[in-house]
């Protein structure tokens, strides 16, 4: 069988200052696929970004430009002179509008008023590469993998359709169907946008790769419910996400970890914080975690909790609760912009990890926590049971008292020193999937689909 060229698009992740689960997935796949491709005897990996109806190959020069843009988005204030910032800060201080204040003084991973200059620089960098002839041409010997957040980049689909009609095989990663199955958490506008995105996925993909068996089954049910499913993708598979963070061993004790993070998550501290890694979003259920700690603080004031995640939508009430909480910065900590190195550090030194999500497509922090050997408390949902197996301690949703009791019981064991060896010493603990194994599963799935396509060519819809 001829070996295809593998192209992976990372349009959203490459220029994004965000570090949510999706960006971590895309970066890890881009890191691991080259060596897996070499093992399989395939040509080297092409990393692409989409711009003006074409896919551009990301060479070192373009990668450097996109890394600059990513850092700019991660903390816009660092890239703007103070005298310029003083104007929007004055407007924010004078305004009674919360929306205007957020626009004038954007939180980490938000551009706010600096969005226009950011887009101008991005447009200039990509235009220059387009003129240099970096465009990737469609080919019947190419597989285009789409693992990114395409509900935010709807302009990509006409280009995908053109490449597919010209013979390129399209493999799309689907993370969840939550905006359709639980629209109350995103609102009608975002739910409608996601509906449009999913329609493009099922109509323009030769293979769909779900990040869990649960999501795979959800996608299959969605397709089966459509009246014109003959024009939709019939090859829906699942693969498992990796667990380790992409941090070189030489850098885990490097200077890139901020002192406030090092001091808070200190190996010598008797009460390092418990950790919740999740974007601030109602479905992530931060409320139950904080409710549990409000109960714990009544008798255990020394306990601490740290929320790590970017500020999302529909979270203003909870953010206000945090800002007004008497334990803020005295047992209650918040970070919106932890890097992978800092995430590695806090996972290594936290007292335990909480995942109270109401619904997930996978729950990446579960496997990240287990990889680091942390005690992991997860809400009792089917997807968490699928991912965490017998390695987690499960608690009922909307029941902070039970969670508080579980944490208190763990604290008694932890502080008594009866948890020597951590959860890795437990009989039920098993090594989570590595990103190399995850990339191998994904690649083997798309190569299998490609080989079937070569042996049994399909007539594509015009």
Describe these PLM feature segments.
Residues 1-462:
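Carbohydrate transferase catalytic cores enriched for Leloir-type hexosyltransferases
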